[in-house]
Amino acid sequence: MSFIRNTIVLGALSALTAAQTTPPKLDASCADVVIFMVRGNDAPYHDGRTFPFVEATCGKLRAEGKTCDYIDVQFDVTLGGDYCAQVAEGARNGISQITAFNQKCPCSHIVVNGYSEGAHVMGDVLGGPGDCTFVSNGLDNTSSAGKAIAAALLWGDVMHTANQPYNVLDGASKQKNPRSPSDLARLNRYAPVLRSYCAAGDPVCAGGNTVADHLNYFQLYTDDASSWVVSKINNVAPLCPASSSSAVPTPTASVSASVIGGNTPTATVSASVIGGNTPTATGAATVYPTSPAVVAPFPRPISYDTCVLKVHVEYCYE
């Protein structure tokens, strides 16, 4: 069985300094939908290759009157770094960040999106470790956070496994370094909401020889993927009663600033903003509304206009 020691994703990548100095977006408002983005190796946060997916998906949701925001999964993607350590860090942080956000915003539907090394990370978030020594069974699909995931997308996945019902494109029946049966079984708990894009020529997910097939997913399939996500959102059951998810909060004048952007109210005033209901002494059963959330403008994606091609893939076999 192959063991990935170091896989450097193929790509026309921005300078390493940009990848390491661009700060991640680690929080979001309690919007109707929040997308968790997981970047590829050596890519910056808000990277120009994958961010069009966020813009397209949120644009279509907003056209339907829904609010939409995103969060970056934080992890190191330094070129030439310890690949398994990077994936483990990303998986741990992904589970932690998704769980924490769901606790803050239990009415928000979650979409997860990972590209290349980021697809490996997101696969591990959902299904546990893929060939690395990170010990986890993944995010329980029956947990509150797991149930909140309405759609999950993997693109050019390092651990792409052939012939899965959620595989799409002409690489659906191909694989390079597939997940073990036990890892795959855990990942497949999310099969109803999962989609994995793999082109036949992609060297990373399909063992092909066409570098461009790994680089152009979002140029070719962003519209298709974003429409699929919107369809999943429109066909999923609400996470909270309609009165909770759509009610406009009515804070008192003294605490109005505490609920701007759908953020969690402070403990002293939380009871006064629950869907306009009569305040209680403890606010123990707080349900935070989503629709009134205020979403800040998205940052400008990091451009790839002046990039250089970097290609390096290593495998160690046991």
Q: For each of these PLM feature ranges, what is it?
A:
Residues 14-15, 159-160, 202:
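Conserved beta-strand elements of beta-rich interaction domains across eukaryotes
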Residues 1-22, 318:
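Fungal secretory targeting signals
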Residues 23-108, 194-222, 231, 235:
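Active-site catalytic motif of lipid deacylating hydrolases and related acyltransferases
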Residues 164-252:
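C-terminal catalytic-base region of ester-bond hydrolases, centering on the histidine
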Residues 94-113, 117-180, 185:
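Serine-dependent carboxylesterase/thioesterase catalytic core
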Residues 19-26, 231, 238-318:
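Fungal extracellular Ser/Thr-rich, low-complexity intrinsically disordered regions
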Residues 61-64, 145, 184-190:
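Short, conserved catalytic or adaptor-binding loops enriched in Gly and charged residues
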